[in-house]
From Swiss-Prot:
GO terms for cellular component: mitochondrial inner membrane. It comes from Pomatostomus superciliosus (White-browed babbler). Binds 2 heme b groups non-covalently. It comes from the Eukaryota. It is a multi-pass membrane protein. This is Cytochrome b.
Length: 79
C-alpha cells in the first residue's frame, strides 16, 4: 500500500494535504488503500510491542548484545 500511496503523495508543505485529499477523493479506492495502510502499520507496531514484551518476560535483556541490536532496530523502525 505504501507504494500506491507514494505515487500520489507530494512532500511540499503547501501541497501535502491537497495530495492526500486528491488520493482519497479522486483515486479509485484511494480511501481504502489509505485506511489499509494506516491499520496495517498500527497492527505492525502492536506486534513489535508484543515481541518486546515477550523478550522482557523471558529475560532476553540479559543477553546485552542481542538486546542492544533489538533496540537499534526498534529506533530505526520508528525513524
Amino acid at each position: 500500500t505504501a507504494l500506491l500511496l507514494a505515487a500520489h503523495y507530494t512532500a511540499d508543505t503547501s501541497l501535502a494535504f491537497a495530495s492526500v485529499t486528491h488520493m482519497c477523493r479522486n483515486v479509485q479506492f484511494g480511501w481504502l488503500i489509505r485506511n489499509l495502510h494506516a491499520n496495517g502499520a498500527s497492527f505492525f507496531f502492536i506486534c513489535i510491542y508484543l515481541h518486546i514484551g515477550r523478550g522482557l518476560y523471558y529475560g532476553s535483556y540479559l543477553n546485552k548484545e542481542t538486546w542492544n541490536i533489538g533496540v537499534i532496530l526498534l529506533l530505526t523502525l520508528m525513524a
